[in-house]
Amino acid sequence: MLHTLHRSPWLTDFAALLRLLSEGDELLLLQDGVTAAVDGNRYLESLRNAPIKVYALNEDLIARGLTGQISNDIIPIDYTDFVRLTVKHSSQMAW
């Protein structure tokens, strides 16, 4: 399943998101959700421990001035890669 987090993790039921993640799922951070990718924040450690790959939309990182602050564990992607993820996963959960 593809999970997309478009809101700040501080304004989301992040614990519920983590509970619903399964091995093989992927999480895309976009819009204000990219703030979860900032190195050193409290949500990042939980994402590191999850059995998933985590991506962040590069355009949203740039728009928020965060490109130099994200963790190396987060994979920046562009819109083409976003489309590939949506094609790969038949189901999606938006947060």
From Swiss-Prot:
Source organism of the structure: Escherichia coli O139:H28 (strain E24377A / ETEC)
GO BP annotations listed: tRNA wobble position uridine thiolation
Main location: cytoplasm
Task performed by this protein: Part of a sulfur-relay system required for 2-thiolation of 5-methylaminomethyl-2-thiouridine (mnm(5)s(2)U) at tRNA wobble positions.
Subunit structure: Heterohexamer, formed by a dimer of trimers. The hexameric TusBCD complex contains 2 copies each of TusB, TusC and TusD. The TusBCD complex interacts with TusE.
Name of this protein: Protein TusB
Keywords: Cytoplasm, tRNA processing
GO CC term (a single one): sulfurtransferase complex
Family that this chain belongs to: Belongs to the DsrH/TusB family.
PANTHER family in the cross-refs: PROTEIN TUSB
Gene name in the database record: tusB
Domain of life according to the entry: Bacteria
HAMAP family: Thiourid_synth_B (MF_01564)
Compartmental location: Cytoplasm
